Amino acid sequence: MPLATIFGGIDILHTNFQHQHWQEWLSSGVDEEIINLNVKSLEGRTPYEYLIYSPKISRRNDGRLRDGDLTKYRHIEHGGWWCNGIDPLDDYNPMMWGCFKPDRPRRDRNKIHKHIKYEHPYKEPTRAFFLQVPLKTWRLVSRYSGIDIPCEDLENPQGFWHWVWRRNVPVVIVEGVKKAACLLTIGYAAIAIPGVNSGYRTPKDEFGNIIGKPNLVPDLKHFATEDRRIDICFDRDKKTETVQHVRTAIKRMGKLLSIEKCKVQVIDLPGPEKGVDDFVVAQGQDSFDELYDKSETLDMWQVKLFTLLTYQPTISLDQKYLGQIQIPDTEKLIVLKSAKGTGKTEWLTGEVAKAHEQNRRVLIITHRIQLGEALCNRFGVNYVTEVKDSGTGDLLGYGVCIDSLHQQSQARFNPNDWYNNTVIIDECDQVFWHLLNSGTEVAKRRVSVLKNLKLLIQNVLSSPQGKIYLASADVSDCDVDYLLSLAGEIKVKPFAILNNYQPQPGNCYSYEGTNPKDLIAALDRAILEGGHHLLCCSAQKAKSKWGTQALEQRFRRKFPDLRILRIDSESVSDPSHPAFGCIAHLNEILTLTGSPVATTGGTPATRWLTKYDLVIASPSLETGVSIDIKGHFSAVWGIFQGVQSANSVRQMLARLRETVDRHIWVKACGMGFVGNGSTSMGSLLASQHAVTRTNIALLSQADNADYSIDENFQPESLQTWAKRACVINAQMRCYREFVLQGLVEDGYRVIDADDVGEEESQGVCDSVKAASQELYVEECQAIANSETISDSEFKKLQDKKAKTKTERHQERKASLNERYGVDVTPELVWKDEDNWYPQLRLHYFLTLGREQLVERDAKRAKSQIETGESAIWKPDFNKGQLLPAVLILEKLNISYFLTPGIMFRGSDVELQKLKALTVQHRYTIRDYLGVTISEGMSAIAIIQKLLSKLGLKLSYVGRMGSRENRERMYQFVEPKDERDSVFAAWQNRVVGVHQQ
């Protein structure tokens, strides 16, 4: 019996429904009219008409189904409900494809304990569900999306989904048709797919082998229009395997939607309900609206996956301070995740004491020397530099920077010495990233350090009493997985301690703008009002306008009586500076006298009389330092220019434990991209593998040498590098967004700061610029005028940790002289700070030094292979090779554009050829030259970008052509930067070596 319908309202007749089917849909929060428009109950032979219609189905000569298929589908005769929608690919007519939920489901042949809940048309490709909706739902979606319904759309027989497609209405993709119906009911244009992998297809041959790239199913492709917001909202599952399966599906489908230029976001259901329909019914529409408003971009969501700790906690806490936590003696790997300022270091101090009571030595591994010294001071253990002159030596263990985990270091490190002992890796996430990517001392012996770390982990975990502690506010699966992968076949279950306590750090005022002038203006006003302030900076060099040194100079000029302490890597290692060695004793350094007061976080705190009005700190103060003094600082200020990770910014702001206002300026986009800059782990790894193979092949071909290397050295380390690189690259693209979101998660209330008047902020810019320039000019002159030292003196200075400013200048001068081979002038110092050396080096080997290039690359390659005992760390190896970059520039005929006197314009044939070639090979150019090319760039923009890698450019000389067709003209003008002198020095150096 047909349904009697009334437009705008439906007279519901239950003839087409069995009661349990009706109730099932109602219990999912679905509007009755939507149910009636799309769902019906079927029984007997009728379900066959809906499911068994494909011409691909094999039948007997009389047209009857084969016995096997009859047996397979016999269960559908017991009845069930059927649902289908409309077909956007067939003029929005009703879709033949749909789904049937049998009352008596059949067993899954592959999973005998599981039943197949839903049946879809046999031998037909899966489709998506576009449910019919009543007018009231259409209007509700219109109101929520803010997109009107023109009369022409309302009167169009193609209806609601044509309007959604035509007007770029945001859509939500869910798994399961009832979930889509539920979201439509509350005003969201929801599309359902039958499974998490049903939004895309991967071409395969008859044997199941993949023969092409994944692509969106046509239904979704139709709606994947540019700038449309598409949210993906799949079920929340508890099974680890299922969770991973769902996440992979979201990544793949999300990437394909992003390729179509959709704005892809992901809604993560918080639980406990599994599906979005259950969530809406249990928590209400307002709760889902909030989830929708807070949904994350695909990039943000992917990054978050690498930052989560999903290991089941053995101990869950929710307390301000960790206090005493008893760890069973049988536990080998202890993972501690607790917010900043909750007493992690204090708790670890107790664990160190316990190890000593049990006659176990303790190895403390950090990524910063100052942090290691501070921790050792707290733990009562010598830092490695103190071992020699200490009465206890290394009897209790020692602290060491991870850079020194090799035999040639001061530690003379041997992983076999730590059997049955304890290892503590504090701020483990930063330690591992420093190990895998830092360009500091560790890069020289990274392979050796990686080998020793792996042996250390295996020795400790395989010993009866050995223990490893991983501790950080940001420890994640990535860190735990990495350590477990290094353990190899040694199976250990992590003993995870999770403290869910979230401090209430107070207000954080965020300053907009392209530079932090408004923040400095606000700090000026705060200083005039009195109090004491902590200013955190991401830079420290004299050249940086917003770094520690320039700002110190600027504040001293503006406030001559202000007592300022600068804390950065130079000041803390300068014996003549007040900040020398201050990291381990910061609370005392900041103050004069005092008396003990109440306990904070399980340790005696001391309240002191003020000594400094302004403390300016670099990332030397990033981790492992706890400023516990109360009532001292009025506010914390931060200038973050995109060179630290987002987590490091949050760490730095949390060094002061007291709840005072934070004021920050964060650059919109960062600058520290890793690898090829991708946020895809697969892309990063594929790029490194391909570049390594190319480098080896080119060298072998060029010098006929056999480069036998272990290309598969520690794949677990390289995979962890790629995971972390994805996080860093995504953060750098949306740097400010990531930092602010992280601060919100830390409990801050982020508030937009008031704008500062143009005159006041411009005055700040002028004063900072003047201070920076004066300081930097003085430094360049001081370096150039410093005493020239011998090679042996230079080596001693390089190995020396504590250096005066004079010694740093001498070391810098010797380094520049060694690098360029010419007299060191203030101008040379300036240019070197401006990244001149890599530009000159590439230009030299493209031209005068081309004959020495293979020898140069081969020498570097053989050195790395020898140091690593046939193993290489691919990112380091690839950075050291120049031959592929030079070959690419030669292929692009770049030398043609360096011919003086030739005039160039964008329409020139040679420039258009260059553009076509660079666009065609843009990914190769990105991987080897680090230059990003897009189709939208002009030919002139492309050549200028390529020439900038050589420190060169085409100069604008004017416009030519008729008034209607005037074009900008350019020509190459040889630079007057004295690079010829450097090239000559390099040539003479090569000749001298060959003569010897």
Stretches found by the model and what they are:
Residues 379-417, 579-604:
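Inter-Walker segment of RecA-like/P-loop motor cores
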Residues 571, 587, 594, 660-996:
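Long, low-complexity intrinsically disordered regions enriched in Ser/Thr/Pro/Gly
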Residues 59-228:
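Phosphate-handling DNA/RNA-contact segment within nucleic-acid enzymes
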Residues 360-372, 475-479, 520-555:
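Conserved strand-helix element at the start of the C-terminal RecA-like helicase core
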Residues 414-458, 467:
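SF2 helicase catalytic motif II
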Residues 1-29, 33-35, 71, 163-169, ...:
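TOPRIM fold recognition
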Residues 627, 633-661:
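Conserved SF2 helicase motif VI
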Residues 477-526:
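Interdomain hinge/linker at the junction between the two RecA-like core domains of SF2 helicases
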